[in-house]
Amino acid sequence: ASKTAYTVYLHLEEVRDLVPTSGPSSLADPYVLVSCAGRSQRTEIVRSQINVNFDRMFIFTDIMLTQDEFERQNIHVQVFNANVIFRNELIGQYSYGFKKVWSQPEPSQHQIHRRWVVLINPDSPEDEQGYMLATVTVLGPGDIPPRPKDAEDESSEVLRAPIQIGKQRRGYNILFRIFRGENM
């Protein structure tokens, strides 16, 4: 199968309301690690904060993928609490699927634009660990990045976002019974 070159842009604007691993009443020393197609980039550590305006662009170029690989590829964003003595601890993470980003309708084709997402720690998936505001773009050969939306539209999106996110997830248990009948 032939491979196509893709480019990924992730504009990390900010993280907000982080829940430090040492407890909700303390501050964190956050940094963000972005991984894509076996490559990683990270921000600097920001000391004693739970709200950080990173305003950092991550660019991953020449990601060679077959169509099947493209459909399974993800962009992983992890927020860590830096520790001097102990191992750095994961606060929360979020993953963007290439296919989902690529399939966004016009006018934001191939882009998820300035969207707040909930950061989750896999060890405690029912608890929100903070929020992240980012724009993600996946482009193939000859693609042109979408034109940014008006600043007025963006600011209203940002102000509304945390209200919309809230804790609304519920866990469910599903019980299946499968019967097999033969020679009835």
Tell what function each PLM region has.
Residues S2-L12, I163-M184:
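PDZ domains - specifically the beta-sandwich core and the conserved carboxylate-binding loop
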Residues T4, S26-A28, E71, R170:
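Residue-level preference for beta-strand/loop junctions
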Residues E13-R16, A28-Y31, E44-F54, I59-M64, ...:
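C2 and C2-like phospholipid-binding beta-sandwich domains
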Residues P20-P24:
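Short consensus segments that form the blades of beta-propeller domains
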Residues S35-R39:
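Short strand-coil-strand connectors
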